[in-house]
Regions:
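Class I S-adenosyl-L-methionine
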Residues: 1-111, 217, 256-268, 272, ...
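A contiguous loop/helix-start segment that scaffolds small-molecule binding in enzyme catalytic cores
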Residues: 6, 159-269
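Short beta-strand segments
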Residues: 10, 79-82, 114, 138-141, ...
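Gly/Ser/Thr-rich loops at beta-strand to alpha-helix junctions
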Residues: 15, 83-88, 117-119, 171-174, ...
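Class I SAM-dependent methyltransferase SAM-binding "motif I" and its flanking Rossmann-like core
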Residues: 15, 21, 90-163
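Short, amphipathic alpha-helical "recognition" segments used to contact nucleic acids or chromatin
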Residues: 270-286, 300
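Short alpha-helical "recognition helix" segments of helix-turn-helix
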Residues: 290-293
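DNA major-groove recognition helix of helix-turn-helix
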Residues: 295, 306
Length: 313
């Protein structure tokens, strides 16, 4: 019997026009299509003549096992997921099931991961450009992750001034997690920090709410919602949520380079310039603790500069 194949397909936010050509081709080639029932509905028009296996919530490992069994019998399987199947999706669990069953890459069943536009990208596109600078995503689902781990990640992201995308913010049974997330974020962020609450991006019941961090938990939020929380520079203007890339740190609005900066070179407070600045402050009698407070950094970062030999450039 010939070996089968498993396509792990991310088909994007749901609208057909946002599905990649490769995702369509993989579904078309498949003998069997497996997915959460809601995902099956979103691609129903592509499934004529195929064996379709619908699964419910909490049956993720069953989907992986079924995909493996069908592929073992020589069939081509498309295990589908909305968004990107490698981002909070089925790619990881599938590989775990395969490896636990003795499968190894290059032997037997072929596996191909097909990426798709994930929820944070889709939601960001609908509200402007909130992800133009450093960002992170955190799932508030504690079904598989202990809350202390989630809280620690929220704390770190808030302190580091990341734009934060919250996945799985709330469900019928999980209503307190978004409130706790808001509390943690408010320890480091202004109550006026812009927030976008996007439900069912690019689907029939799409809704968008622009609000502030202080009101975030009061918004209509559910399992199909992604929440985007700005950093200290994010702003909303004319209905657009925008996070500056940082050009204002180096350039005037005229396009001219600011005094002390050079086009195409690190900022004056880039890594080298920052270390020079730290050494200057130390030579002026400032203590490591004072310098750490000035830059809002752990004192160990200042001590690391003190322990280095100055670079000669």
């Amino acid at each position: 019997m010939s070996n089968g194949k498993i396509y792990l397909v991310g088909f994007g936010p749901g609208a057909q026009e946002h599905m990649s050509y490769r995702a369509r081709a993989a579904i078309a080639e498949a003998d069997v299509v497996i997915g959460y029932s809601t995902y099956i509905k979103l691609v129903q028009e592509l499934l004529d003549g195929k064996q379709v296996i619908k699964k419910g919530m909490t049956e993720e490992l069953d989907r992986c096992t079924e995909a493996y069994e069908h592929a073992r019998h020589g069939r081509i399987v498309a295990l589908i997921s909305s968004g990107d199947i490698g981002v909070y999706g089925m790619a990881g669990p599938t590989y775990e099931v395969l490896l636990a069953s003795g499968w190894r890459p290059g032997t037997g069943i072929e596996v191909e991961v097909i990426p798709g536009a994930t929820a944070l990208s889709a939601c960001a596109a609908l509200v402007g450009a909130p992800l133009t600078h450093d960002f992170c995503s955190i799932s508030l689902s504690d079904l598989l992750t202990p809350w202390p781990v989630i809280a620690r990640r929220l704390e770190a992201a808030a302190y580091a001034d990341f734009v934060v995308a919250l996945y799985n913010p709330k469900s019928g049974r999980r209503t307190g997690q978004i409130v706790e997330a808001q509390r943690i974020l408010l320890q480091h962020r202004s109550p006026d920090t812009p927030v976008a609450v996007v439900k069912s991006a690019y689907r029939r019941k799409q809704s968008i709410q622009l609000t502030r961090l202080a009101q975030m938990a009061d918004c209509e939020i559910g399992m199909l919602t992604t929440v985007l929380i700005g950093n200290s520079n994010t702003f909303v203007q004319d209905g657009l949520m925008i996070t500056p890339r940082g050009y204002a740190n180096k350039y005037q609005v005229t396009g001219e380079v600011k005094d002390g900066e050079q086009a195409g070179r690190s900022l004056s407070l880039g890594l080298h310039g920052w270390k020079v600045n730290v050494r200057e402050r130390l030579s002026q009698g400032q203590t490591p603790d004072e310098i750490a407070r000035h830059f809002d950094l752990p004192v160990i970062e200042i001590e690391s500069v003190m322990n280095e030999e100055p670079a000669h450039v």
